Amino acid sequence: MARGCLCCLKYMMFLFNLIFWLCGCGLLGVGIWLSVSQGNFATFSPSFPSLSAANLVIAIGTIVMVTGFLGCLGAIKENRCLLLSFFIVLLIILLAELILIILFFVYMDKVNENARKDLKEGLLLYNSENNVGLKNAWNIIQAEMHCCGVTDYTDWYPVLGENTVPDRCCMENSQGCGRNSTTPLWKTGCYEKVKMWFDDNKHVLGTVGMCILIMQILGMAFSMTLFQHIHRTGKKYDA
């Protein structure tokens, strides 16, 4: 009976972590594709030049893939050492997430202030040769979100010249429209637009966050339960 429960739990955890591992592989693949095809796409911050969309997705994908692999191997081998490692990794990730969320809300005003300042400094690199990714990112976000600059369109004046903005700031986009002072422009800054997007989608984001939290807790529960079952049935392991 105990052995049957152990087998059932083992394969449930293996399947759970196999899905986890496949998701990690998918994220890693997307990150590598972004890195190869888009270069430094979405590198907005001059203070953190490595914090691009590609690098972020690669890092998350790698963590998810390694964690899933630990869980799969620990379950199928019934190895208490690997199961404990899997539990500790998930616990560290969970604690790191909670600490980051708490710090974000405690220092929200400071985060907003520094983010705006850093993004404005990043605009100065818009036309530099080594920052094509930053230029692409700003062009896309301004066109898609109907915004201009960080706080408003005047953020571009010190970068491109008086009364000059990127063409994607124009309500009716056309070649050279950003140099025409009479062209209607998007007035709202992109920072405010992004904040509005997060506010409009907070329920969806909250649901996604809750699902991730539940998956992490389930993974920890599966690993500890399997760990205890192996211990009770006297299963030995290789350290």
Swiss-Prot record:
It is found in: Membrane. Residues 35-55, 107-203 are extracellular. The chain crosses the membrane at residues 14-34, 56-76, 86-106, 204-224. Glycosylated. Disulfide bonds: none annotated. Residues 1-13, 77-85, 225-239 are cytoplasmic. InterPro entries: Tetraspanin/Peripherin (IPR018499), Tetraspanin_animals (IPR000301), Tetraspanin_CS (IPR018503), Tetraspanin_EC2_sf (IPR008952). The lineage of its organism: Eukaryota, Metazoa, Chordata, Craniata, Vertebrata. Found in a complex with GP6. This is Tetraspanin-9. Keywords: Glycoprotein, Membrane, Transmembrane, Transmembrane helix. GO terms for cellular component: plasma membrane. Belongs to the tetraspanin (TM4SF) family. Pfam families: Tetraspanin. Its main location: membrane. It comes from Sus scrofa (Pig). It is a multi-pass membrane protein. Glycans are attached at N180. The keyword ATP-binding does not apply.
